[in-house]
C-alpha cells in the first residue's frame, strides 16, 4: 500500500509504527454553522481510507476533533445572544447528523478543544521550559518559530519565503513578538469571550496547539497518518509539527495526507466567500449516497468541481450498481439451493480478478476513481452471468463481492425494503380506527412501526399526512 506523503512529496510504502495497527488523526470542522459539502470532502475521503485500512486487516484508531472555541463561534454567539458553548454543541450535533447521512462512521474518539485545556497548558509550559515559546507582557504566549530548525518542512518553504508571501497569515500583535513569524499559543481574554485561567493570563488557546494536544492524548507522541484539507498545510499543520516535535522530541506524523478543494465554478467553496451548499441543501435534492459517490469519483488529491450535471451522472452510476445488486438478490431468492458447480467456481475466480483490481487501485494512494471502475467491471461481469441458470450460492457470492467493495467505499447499495403506498395507507387507517376506539397504546405502536420503516406521520386538521424520511 502506497500513500502520497505531503512531507516528502512522493508516494511511499505504508509501514505502520506498530504492526497491524494504524494511528490516524483527521482535523475536523470548526462548529459554528451547518457543514458545507466542501467540509464533507475530507470527512468522506478519510472515512474511506479508514474503511480500506480495516478491510485490509488493520486495527485503526481514528481520531477527529471538533474545534469548539474560535472567533467565528464567538461571533455567532454574540449575534444570537447566547453562550459560545450553545453554538458549538448545537452544530456538533448537526454535524454528526450530516456525517451519519453520508455514512461517515463516527471516529474512535471525537475530542473537543474546550475539554482538553489542561493538556494545552501542559504542552505550552513544556515549550516555554525548552525555549521554544515565551510569554509577552500581557500574557500572550508565542511560539518562537526560528527556534525550530525544521520549520517549513511540510509546506516546503523556508523562512525567507514566509517573511514574504505567507507573512500576513502569521503576523498579529507584532509589537510584542520577538519575531514577526512567531505565532500564538495562548491569547488573553476579551470582553464577553469564554476564557480559562492559566499561569500566563485568563484567556484561551490558539488554534494550532489544540490539535497537537488532542493528537498526543488519544494517539501518543508519534502517529502514522495526519490528514486534512490542503488549506491546512500552512500554517496549521506546519505549526502542529513545530509544537509537537519540539515538545515531545519525536517525529510527529509519519505520513501527511491532504485532499484537494471542492470547487464551484472553479473557485474554492467556502462560507466566507458565500459560494457554498450545505450538506443539508444537497441531501434534500439527492440521495446522500449520490453525494458520497460524487466525492469518490475523483482522486482525493485532484480538485473536484461541483455541478448538477456531475451529480446526475453520479446518481445514474450509483443506480446501476444498485440495480445489479437487486437483480442478484432476486436471482438468489429464486435459484436452486445447492452447492457451487465447478463452472461457477471458475466464474467466481474470474470475479476475484476484479476484486484484485479494486485492491490495486486503493493500494495506489487510495485511487477511488479506479476502484469504483473496478466495481463497475464486476457489475458488468455479473450482468453477463445473468442469462444462465446458476445456484443460489453463486448469485449470493457475486452479490457479496459487489456489496463488500461498495461498503469499503462507504456506499450503501442494497435498497431497504420499502412499504408500498397502499401498505402505508392501510396502517394509517388501522391507527385511525384504534384512536377512535381509544386504544391509544396500539395507535402509538403503529406510529412507531411506521417511523421504524422510514415513514413520518403528521396529524393535521385535514387528516393524517405522511412522508418518507
Residue locations for each model-derived region?
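Alpha-helical recognition segments enriched in aromatics with Gly/Pro capping
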Residues: 1-32, 47, 118-329
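The substrate-binding groove and active-site-proximal loops of carbohydrate-active enzymes
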Residues: 78-84, 108-114, 229
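Structural preference for alpha-helix termini/caps and helix-kink/transition segments
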Residues: 268, 275-469
Amino acid at each position: 500500500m502506497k500513500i502520497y506523503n505531503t512531507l516528502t512529496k512522493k508516494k511511499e510504502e505504508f509501514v505502520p509504527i506498530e504492526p497491524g495497527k494504524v494511528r490516524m488523526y483527521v482535523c475536523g470542522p470548526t462548529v459554528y454553522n451547518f457543514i458545507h459539502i466542501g467540509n464533507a470532502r475530507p470527512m468522506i475521503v478519510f472515512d474511506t481510507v479508514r474503511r480500506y485500512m480495516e478491510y485490509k486487516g488493520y486495527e485503526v484508531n481514528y481520531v477527529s476533533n471538533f474545534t469548539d472555541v474560535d472567533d467565528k463561534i464567538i461571533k455567532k454567539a454574540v449575534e444570537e445572544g447566547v453562550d459560545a458553548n450553545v453554538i458549538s454543541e448545537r452544530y456538533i450535533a448537526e454535524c454528526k447528523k450530516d456525517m451519519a447521512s453520508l455514512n461517515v462512521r463516527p471516529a474512535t474518539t471525537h475530542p473537543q478543544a474546550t475539554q482538553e485545556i489542561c493538556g494545552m497548558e501542559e504542552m505550552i509550559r513544556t515549550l516555554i521550559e525548552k525555549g521554544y515559546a515565551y510569554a509577552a507582557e500581557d500574557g500572550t504566549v508565542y511560539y518562537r518559530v526560528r527556534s525550530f530548525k525544521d520549520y517549513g518542512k511540510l509546506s516546503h518553504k523556508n523562512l525567507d519565503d514566509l517573511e514574504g508571501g505567507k507573512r500576513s497569515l502569521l503576523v498579529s500583535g507584532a509589537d510584542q513578538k520577538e519575531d514577526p513569524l512567531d505565532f500564538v499559543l495562548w491569547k488573553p481574554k476579551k470582553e464577553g469571550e469564554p476564557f480559562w485561567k492559566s499561569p500566563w493570563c485568563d484567556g484561551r488557546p490558539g488554534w494550532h496547539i489544540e490539535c497537537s494536544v488532542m493528537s498526543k492524548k488519544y494517539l501518543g507522541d508519534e502517529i502514522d497518518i495526519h490528514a486534512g484539507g490542503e488549506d491546512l498545510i500552512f500554517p496549521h499543520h506546519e505549526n502542529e509539527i513545530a509544537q509537537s516535535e519540539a515538545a515531545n522530541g519525536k517525529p510527529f506524523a509519519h505520513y501527511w495526507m491532504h485532499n484537494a478543494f471542492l470547487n464551484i465554478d472553479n473557485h474554492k467553496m467556502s462560507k466566507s466567500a458565500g459560494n457554498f451548499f450545505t450538506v443539508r441543501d444537497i441531501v434534500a435534492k439527492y440521495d446522500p449516497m449520490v453525494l458520497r459517490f460524487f466525492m469518490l469519483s475523483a482522486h482525493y488529491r485532484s480538485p473536484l468541481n461541483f455541478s448538477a450535471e456531475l451529480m446526475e451522472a453520479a446518481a445514474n452510476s450509483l443506480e446501476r450498481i444498485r440495480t445489479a445488486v437487486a437483480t442478484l438478490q432476486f436471482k438468489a431468492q429464486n435459484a436452486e439451493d445447492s452447492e457451487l458447480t465447478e463452472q461457477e467456481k471458475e466464474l467466481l475466480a474470474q470475479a476475484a480478478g476484479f476484486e484484485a483490481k479494486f485492491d490495486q487501485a486503493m493500494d495506489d494512494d487510495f485511487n477511488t476513481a479506479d476502484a469504483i471502475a473496478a466495481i463497475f467491471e464486476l457489475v458488468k461481469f455479473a450482468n453477463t452471468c445473468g442469462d444462465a441458470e446458476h445456484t443460489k450460492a453463486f448469485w449470493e457470492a457475486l452479490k457479496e463481492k459487489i456489496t463488500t467493495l461498495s461498503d469499503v467505499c462507504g456506499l450503501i447499495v442494497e435498497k431497504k425494503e420499502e412499504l408500498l403506498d397502499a401498505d402505508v395507507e392501510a396502517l394509517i387507517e388501522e391507527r385511525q380506527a384504534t384512536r377512535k376506539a381509544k386504544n391509544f397504546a396500539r395507535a402509538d405502536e403503529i406510529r412507531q412501526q411506521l417511523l421504524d420503516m422510514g415513514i413520518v406521520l403528521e396529524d393535521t386538521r385535514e387528516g393524517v399526512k405522511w412522508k418518507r424520511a
